[in-house]
Amino acid sequence: MAVTDELLGPILRDVSRSFYLTLRVLPSTVRSQIALAYLLARTTDTIADTQLVPAEKRMQKLQQFRARIRDEGAPPVDFTHLAREQDNEAERVLLQHSGEAIALLDKMAGADRGQIQLVLETITRGQELDLVRFGDGRKLKALETADDLDDYTY
């Protein structure tokens, strides 16, 4: 099975639940771009939500991965430790194939790549804010201002 087929087939299906079914109704001209954007976003979500890894380490990996999404010349991110900490097999496989997802992004046409990078920039900034605001997530913590709430819900 080709890398693209595996990423946008079984791996996407296993981590996306109903979204995988939704992709079938999208125009074929945008299906692979949206599928890849979803896979990258799901990867960043897995990074941010791995509770067995300290929040500081998750933040570091999230920032490294965002840098790699943004810049083809940035070093690859090693998710070996993070993948080992996954209880969910599908998320483990997703992390193990993150380099292949990045390689697909690097091959995308400039406009498509730029749109995916923009979406992932917004998503990862929000995930970073969550890690700063809520840390390890063990204690309930309210947002302090209406602006914080607006930022959080964006």
Q: Which residues does each predicted region cover?
A:
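Acidic catalytic motifs of isoprenoid enzymes
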Residues: 1-154
